[in-house]
């Protein structure tokens, strides 16, 4: 079905499919947008009045993008920050749903921030750090620089990317 610019567009498409009685296409629409096929069934059965709320549509888009990118580790935490912002702010949900806003670009901004703000890890920490190398536990060797943004910076970068703040 392609990319939707808003939850309203998504719900209008769902409304058309419901009016045609096309439950199978409605289920496909739901799954393509990170929702469950059961959400489509609930919509057709009249249990809910729309296929997706603003939060469901935004979280669904992020879920689909996250899966495609194989998001894991610290980037999973960064992704979760977007969902948390959506839960707190309907305008943020709308911004996430916009065409041209993508999780990969937000992640790229966080990685750029991480690189630009890296700091050396203390030698005191490194000399007691063990790492697996070739299947063997060894002392960490060499300098290490980290620049992982704190939670406040992650939120700030998310708001700047998605909302332009």
Where are these regions (language model features)?
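Phenylalanine-focused residue identity feature
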Residues: 1-4, 92, 115, 140
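Low-complexity, interaction-prone regions
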Residues: 1-79, 163-165
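Short amphipathic alpha-helical patches
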Residues: 37, 106, 133-134
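Sequence-level detector for tyrosine residue identity
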Residues: 43, 102, 106, 113, ...
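Short, compositionally biased low-complexity segments
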Residues: 47-57, 80-83, 124-135
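Charged, amphipathic alpha-helical linker/scaffold segments
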Residues: 57-116, 120
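Long, highly charged low-complexity segments enriched in Glu/Asp and Lys/Arg with interspersed Ser/Thr
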Residues: 117-165
